[in-house]
């Protein structure tokens, strides 16, 4: 019975990864085609494209780890392999989180309005602020990598230069993974906090705008209010998906003794994979250009499919 549930959980994770590949690949492809045709790309599309590539990279890394852990349940892992796996996971997850936070920061500076000299100064330099935020995050990535590598060196020395990579082993499941998750929670909470802050400030900006409209007896919504609402709808889904991702990390920390159970690990992976896969679908639905291109592709596929079926029926009737 456990084998059936494990296979079902693994199948669900793989489906989520495939959906994430398709969604993020579509975003990257559409933006790259527009970039090639127009010979220029906007700052927003730059962030979306970089975010899509980072999540493709993240999902590919997760898929590789799942495939290896499923096919080879007992693998002797050297110090270099452990560091390599963790570097790819940390690197891809770092840029996935920080680029998403930079996207929220870009929306906030572009849409929100505050009569403050500092805010106006930042608003006039959106590209520099976003680029600077991403560059400063590299320091956190370096620190996170340094801490993880120091921990790996210490533990591998304790286990005589090797670790038995077995999810049923207490050495790796309940100890090694927990420290990794704790570090990820600490460093991942920073971009998540930034996203929450920009989300709350957008709500406050919308509230101030509505209050100002009421004072001037303007009852109909204007363009600025509509822009606030559209961005807030996108930010709400992002915050919820990111909260689900943090839930999966918290589950692994609070119930660390269950990490030796492969079913529990797979369930946490299912919850965590919702964020990079689901957010790409949300971005496609909320972005006008991406949504229009996606609907055009669906219409083209529908036409191809409807023209393909009569040809099959004609060939089958000729055979019989």
UniProtKB/Swiss-Prot annotation:
CDD domains, per the entry: 7tm_TAS2R14-like
Gene Ontology CC: one annotated term: membrane
Ranges of the Extracellular topological domain: 1-8, 77-88, 150-185, 255-264
Membrane-side (Cytoplasmic) residue stretches: 30-55, 110-128, 207-233, 286-320
Keyword Transmembrane applies: yes
Matching Pfam families: TAS2R
GO terms, molecular function: bitter taste receptor activity; G protein-coupled receptor activity
Principal cellular location given in the protein's record: membrane
Membrane topology: Multi-pass membrane protein
Glycosylation sites: 170
Membrane-crossing segments per the record: 9-29, 56-76, 89-109, 129-149, 186-206, 234-254, 265-285
Alphabetized UniProt keyword annotations: G-protein coupled receptor, Glycoprotein, Membrane, Receptor, Sensory transduction, Taste, Transducer, Transmembrane, Transmembrane helix
InterPro entries: TAS2R (IPR007960)
Subcellular location: Membrane
Domain of life: Eukaryota
The protein's role, per its UniProt record: Putative taste receptor which may play a role in the perception of bitterness.
Something else known: Several bitter taste receptors are expressed in a single taste receptor cell.
Family: Belongs to the G-protein coupled receptor T2R family.
Protein name (Swiss-Prot/TrEMBL): Taste receptor type 2 member 129
């Amino acid at each position: 019975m456990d084998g059936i549930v494990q296979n079902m959980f693994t199948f669900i994770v793989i489906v989520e990864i495939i959906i994430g590949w398709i969604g993020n690949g579509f975003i990257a492809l559409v933006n790259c085609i527009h970039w090639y045709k127009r010979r220029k790309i906007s700052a927003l599309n730059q962030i979306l494209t970089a975010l899509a590539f980072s999540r493709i990279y993240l999902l590919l890394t997760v898929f590789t780890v799942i495939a290896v852990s499923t096919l080879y349940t007992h693998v002797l892992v050297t110090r270099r392999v452990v560091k390599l796996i963790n570097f790819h996971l940390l690197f891809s997850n770092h840029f996935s989180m920080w680029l998403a936070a930079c996207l929220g920061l870009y929306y906030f500076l572009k849409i929100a309005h505050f009569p403050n000299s500092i805010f106006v100064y930042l608003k006039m330099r959106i590209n520099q602020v976003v680029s600077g935020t991403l560059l400063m995050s590299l320091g956190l990535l370096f620190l996170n990598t340094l801490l993880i590598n120091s921990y790996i060196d210490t533990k591998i020395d304790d286990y005589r230069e090797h670790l038995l990579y077995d999810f049923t082993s207490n050495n790796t499941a309940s100890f090694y993974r927990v420290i990794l998750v704790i570090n990820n929670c600490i460093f991942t909470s920073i971009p998540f906090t930034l996203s929450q802050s920009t989300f709350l400030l957008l709500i406050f900006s919308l509230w101030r705008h509505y209050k100002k409209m009421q004072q001037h007896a303007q009852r109909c919504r204007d363009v600025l209010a509509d822009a606030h609402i559209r961005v807030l709808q996108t930010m709400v889904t992002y915050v919820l998906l990111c909260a689900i991702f943090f839930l999966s990390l918290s589950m692994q920390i609070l119930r660390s003794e269950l990490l030796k159970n492969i079913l529990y690990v797979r369930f946490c992976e299912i919850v965590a994979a919702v964020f990079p896969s689901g957010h790409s679908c949300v971005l496609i639905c909320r972005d006008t250009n991406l949504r229009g291109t996606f609907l055009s592709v669906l219409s083209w596929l529908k036409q191809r499919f409807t023209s393909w079926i009569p040809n099959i029926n004609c060939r089958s009737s000729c055979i019989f």
